């Protein structure tokens, strides 16, 4: 996948929308591969960080300025940050050595209280999980390539990942409701049925 092209489509689309107010719009390309990824990391991470260093996009729409949750945030971290120690944020001192979140790495730190990440364990790095801090991670059934494809449809709408969580768990949330309600009003080219269709196409096939 051409990750630079995929994520630049998001950036370019936002720049063309006169109703969108862009706070941050950064897609930093990598000139060489970052050597901090473990060899066993899924191929998608090696491909991604061979092209892109980090992505930080924040936007809102002036028609909905009074609704703080009607906005977009993407914050895909540099590889050296992703594969660093997340003690004090994801997990804390005093927990058992076997605590599974010690192996959890944050990829898209889109808001202070939640993120999308993965388990840095050989054979388990492919699938991304949604983590609302102090709760258990929810497997999203997609890898980094699928995540970027869905980002290009959702434009990083605030908590857009909750729509996937709803599809998986059948549990409704205000965030998912906002996504389905406001995205068609913000972007005329957005279609929730198409979003679901693409999600089903990029889901990891379980064997």
Protein language model annotation of sequence segments:
Residues 3, 133-136, 172:
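Generic alpha-helical structural element
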Residues 1, 7, 141-145, 157, ...:
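Alpha-helix initiation and N-capping motif
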Residues 127-161:
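Compact, glycine/acidic-enriched structural inserts
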Residues 114-121:
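Short, surface-exposed beta-strand/loop micro-motifs that present aromatic residues
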Residues 101, 123-126:
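A short, compositionally biased
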């Amino acid at each position: 996948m051409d990750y630079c092209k995929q994520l630049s489509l998001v950036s370019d689309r936002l720049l063309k929308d006169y109703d969108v107010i862009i706070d941050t719009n950064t897609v930093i390309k990598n000139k060489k591969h970052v050597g901090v990824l473990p060899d066993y990391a899924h191929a998608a991470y090696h491909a991604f960080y061979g092209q892109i260093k980090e992505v930080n996009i924040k936007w809102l729409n002036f028609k909905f300025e009074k609704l703080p949750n009607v906005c977009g945030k993407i914050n895909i971290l540099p590889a050296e940050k992703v594969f660093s120690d997340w003690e004090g944020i994801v997990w804390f001192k005093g927990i058992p050595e076997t605590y599974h979140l010690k192996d959890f790495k944050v990829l898209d730190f889109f808001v202070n209280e939640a993120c999308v990440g993965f388990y840095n364990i050989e054979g388990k790095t492919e699938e991304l999980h949604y983590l609302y801090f102090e709760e258990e991670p929810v497997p999203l059934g997609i890898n980094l390539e699928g995540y970027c494809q869905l980002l290009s449809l959702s434009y990083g709408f605030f908590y857009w990942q909750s729509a996937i969580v709803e599809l998986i768990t059948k549990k409704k949330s205000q965030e998912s409701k906002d996504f389905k309600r406001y995205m068609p009003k913000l972007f005329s080219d957005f279609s929730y049925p198409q979003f679901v269709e693409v999600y089903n196409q990029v889901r990891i096939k379980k064997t």
